[in-house]
UniProtKB/Swiss-Prot annotation:
Species of origin: Trichomonas vaginalis
Keyword Thylakoid attributed: no
InterPro entries: aa-tRNA-synth_Ia, Rossmann-like_a/b/a_fold, Val/Leu/Ile-tRNA-synth_edit, Valyl-tRNA_ligase
Positions annotated to bind ATP: 485
Gene Ontology terms: biological process: valyl-tRNA aminoacylation
Alphabetical list of PANTHER family matching this protein: VALINE--TRNA LIGASE, VALYL-TRNA SYNTHETASES
Catalysed reactions, as listed in the record: tRNA(Val) + L-valine + ATP = L-valyl-tRNA(Val) + AMP + diphosphate
Name of the gene this protein is made from: VALS
Name of this chain's protein: Valine--tRNA ligase
Similarity-based family: Belongs to the class-I aminoacyl-tRNA synthetase family.
């Protein structure tokens, strides 16, 4: 397995340790050359260790997820899903690693619980540590749509003060009589110097919790993004650059790393009489596995798989007895996961991995629009032909540009039960070895890997990839931690 983000992190660290070069100081070609050398050395170790353990395996069938045959399978799957409308490009909230400057999967996020004010290290920032587990209380001043202030304030509480830069509304519960007089009113955003609306939202706001007034930051919070979908008139703003600095347009805070901006915003609000207090607050904080950075939620254009119908088929396979999960206590988790499934983000802003086989189309030097803007193809020549057909023009008017992003490792991993035995070209071998009888794996990747193998297999082959899923407990180290490349254990 080429192990995408984990491998890139290790190779970048190796390059820095040996050459003192950071990403951005060397070319993609140089990185890939170093990565292939590192992979070759580790592959030999992996195979020798398997032999030393007495593994009885079909050594002649060893494959690597970036070799030519596997890559062809992955590209074929992407094209088929794209052409069927199941893969699409959209701007949505994703987990973002500011240190690595890429979208990451839920599997690459580890959560810690803070019971009180706790100082943590954050990469690429000014100070050694920053406080978390703190609820900051500040004020917004009430105004009309023209920004004329009434003299009244509302109190807002947040654990992420810096995100107020991206607030596009504050919300109240329509049943909360305390705020009836604020219906149709606005609050003054003191840093952007604009009025933002007070909206009514019964789903977001519990009027019996806190002050009953909630900031709404659709560009950086999943719950607030849902508010935006219910109230699209409020709009959304992304306040961060890819490396986690405050974007231009936010006064003196622009250019600061996000948690440095938080520190300075507290001082600024105190000077302007807008900061009330801060209190210890229990919270759950997402940390990136690789760079140990604080995970951000950001809106970026990415590639997604529409998994809604796939998930329904995965549930049905278990209900019908076609797929058995052992121990059966995990059936509840299986159903809960698939009933609440979200679109799967499959693009990564990395150098290591299989480049996404999607091409953006230009007609006479101008970007195409609508359904003809992007095509999926196995080559540039095929992309030009598809782009011409999609836009009803002759190929000579078409140029294409391949997306620079790479596919999520989990995408290629999801195809392994059939891509590893010849799909889609070697039908004889596929019929001999697919579907498998049993998958034996750790319970911790039931949703990240097993679920996706089942969904991809049902969608692309119309068969379950195996008939039994046998889940084992986890082997842990002396400190109780699971085996992890990021822990080095």
């Amino acid at each position: 397995d080429h192990a995408g983000i984990a491998t890139q992190f290790r190779v970048e660290k190796k390059i820095y340790d040996e050459k003192k070069l950071h990403r951005g100081e060397y070319s993609r070609e140089y990185f890939l050359e170093e990565a292939h050398k590192w992979v070759e050395s580790k592959s030999g170790t992996i195979l020798s260790q398997l032999r030393d353990m007495g593994s009885s395996l079909a050594w002649k069938d060893t494959y690597y997820t970036l070799d030519e045959k596997l890559s062809e399978s992955v590209i074929a799957a992407f094209i088929k899903l794209f052409d069927e409308g199941l893969i699409y490009r959209s701007e949505r909230l994703v987990n973002w690693d500011c240190a690595l400057k890429t979208a990451i999967s839920d599997a690459e996020v580890e959560y810690i619980t803070l019971t009180k004010r706790t100082k943590l290290n954050v990469p690429n920032h000014k100070y050694p540590q920053y406080p978390f587990g703190v609820m900051a209380h500040f004020y917004y001043e009430i105004c009309d749509k023209d920004g004329k202030k009434t003299g009244e304030k509302v109190e807002i509480a947040t654990t992420r003060l810096e995100t107020m830069l991206g607030d596009t509304a504050v919300a109240i519960n329509p049943k909360d009589a305390r705020y009836n007089h604020l219906h149709g009113m606005y609050v003054w955003h003191p840093i952007r110097e604009v009025p933002i609306p007070i909206i009514q939202d019964e789903i977001l706001v519990d009027m019996n919790f806190g002050t009953g007034v909630v900031k709404v930051t659709p560009g950086h919070d999943p719950n607030d993004y849902e508010v935006y979908k219910r109230h699209p008139e409020i709009g959304l703003i992304s306040i961060l650059t890819p490396d986690g600095a405050i974007a231009p347009g936010y006064g003196q805070f622009s250019g600061m790393m996000r948690f440095d901006a938080r520190v300075e915003m507290v001082k600024w609000m105190k000077e302007h009489g807008l900061y009330k207090e801060e209190k210890d607050h229990e919270m759950r904080l997402g940390i990136t596995q690789r760079g140990h950075d604080i995970v951000e939620q950001v809106i970026t254009p990415q590639w997604f798989v529409n998994t809604t119908d796939m998930a329904a088929r995965a549930i049905k396979a278990v209900d019908d007895g076609e797929l058995k999960i052992v121990p059966d206590e995990f059936v509840v988790d299986w159903k809960k996961w698939h009933e609440n499934i979200r679109p799967w983000c499959i693009s990564r802003q990395l150098m290591w991995g299989l480049r996404i086989p999607a091409y953006r189309v230009q007609i006479d030097g101008k970007w195409a629009e609508g359904n003809g803007e992007w095509v999926a193809a196995a080559s540039q020549e095929e992309a030009i032909a598809k782009g011409a057909k999609a836009n009803n023009v002759v190929p000579s008017r078409v140029t294409v540009e391949q997306d620079p992003d790479v596919l999520d490792t989990w995408f290629s991993s999801a195809l392994l039960p059939f891509s590893g035995v010849g799909w889609p070209s070697n039908e004889e071998r596929l019929n001999r070895y697919f579907p498998n009888s049993i998958l034996e794996t750790g319970w911790d990747i039931l949703t990240f890997w097993v679920s996706r193998m089942v969904m991809m297999s049902l969608t692309l082959t119309n068969k379950v990839p195996f008939h039994t899923i046998l889940l084992h407990p986890l082997v842990r180290d002396a400190q109780g931690r699971k085996m992890s490349k990021s822990f080095g254990n």
